[in-house]
Amino acid sequence: MAKATTIKEALARWEEKTSQKPSEAREIKLYAQIPPIEKMDASLSTLSNCEKLSLSTNCIEKIANLNGLKNLRILSLGRNNIKNLNGLEAVGDTLEELWISYNFIEKLKGIHVMKKLKILYMSNNLVKDWAEFVKLAELPCLEDLVFVGNPLEEKHSAEGNWVEEATKRVPKLKKLDGTPVIKEDEEEDN
């Protein structure tokens, strides 16, 4: 089997293709590398101007080495092999959007550090307990959540009470699974 692509190699390819210096670029796309990236290695720390980083559709197992990304606002890690959210603390003060659907995340430990997170797309993961889901209420700015395809959502959607139960536990949500959230008290005002 082919050896994994390193971040350094992927950045060199990206630089060649775009004629931009990775250290100066605001948006860097390293998705769907062949062979796939397996590790978020220390080369990421050179991306000091990066505001949007896409590493989706690779084989990354751990979130790591984000400490140099002082301006990161959008991180795309969908379709990888990520099992937990450890490693996000380095971008806790800047990250506004986390796209992490189609991974293997069961627990939301570590999510509370995301002080500015407004958008969380984490469909098709493995979250099955309300005890984990309620950790999302600790995010002061979270407004838009996509959670479809997690065992918890599937169970409660089948029972017909997903939206009601989810918005009760995370009341600040304005959008859930792509649909605007309509609050009971707002309906009465009309």
Swiss-Prot record:
It is found in: Cytoplasm, Cytoskeleton, Cilium axoneme. The modification N-acetylalanine is found at residue 2. The keyword Acetylation applies. Keywords: Acetylation, Cell projection, Cytoplasm, Cytoskeleton, Dynein, Leucine-rich repeat, Microtubule, Motor protein, Phosphoprotein, Repeat. Residues 150-190 form the LRRCT domain. LRR repeats lie at residues 49-70, 71-92, 94-115, 116-137. The modification Phosphoserine is found at residue 56. Coiled coil: none annotated. One of its GO terms (cellular component) is microtubule. GO terms for molecular function: alpha-tubulin binding; dynein heavy chain binding. SUPFAM superfamilies: L domain-like. Outer (ODAs) and inner (IDAs) dynein arms contain the molecular motors that generate the force to move cilia by ATP-dependent reactions. There are two mechanosensory systems that monitor and respond to the mechanical state (curvature) of the axoneme. One system involves the central pair microtubule complex and radial spokes and the second system involves the outer dynein arms. Belongs to the dynein light chain LC1-type family. Interacts with ZMYND10 (via C-terminus). Interacts with DNAH5, a outer arm dynein heavy chain. Interacts with tubulin located within the A-tubule of the outer doublets in a ATP-independent manner. Part of the multisubunit axonemal ATPase complexes that generate the force for cilia motility and govern beat frequency. Component of the outer arm dynein (ODA). May be involved in a mechanosensory feedback mechanism controlling ODA activity based on external conformational cues by tethering the outer arm dynein heavy chain (DNAH5) to the microtubule within the axoneme. Important for ciliary function in the airways and for the function of the cilia that produce the nodal flow essential for the determination of the left-right asymmetry. This is Dynein axonemal light chain 1. It comes from Bos taurus. The gene is DNAL1.
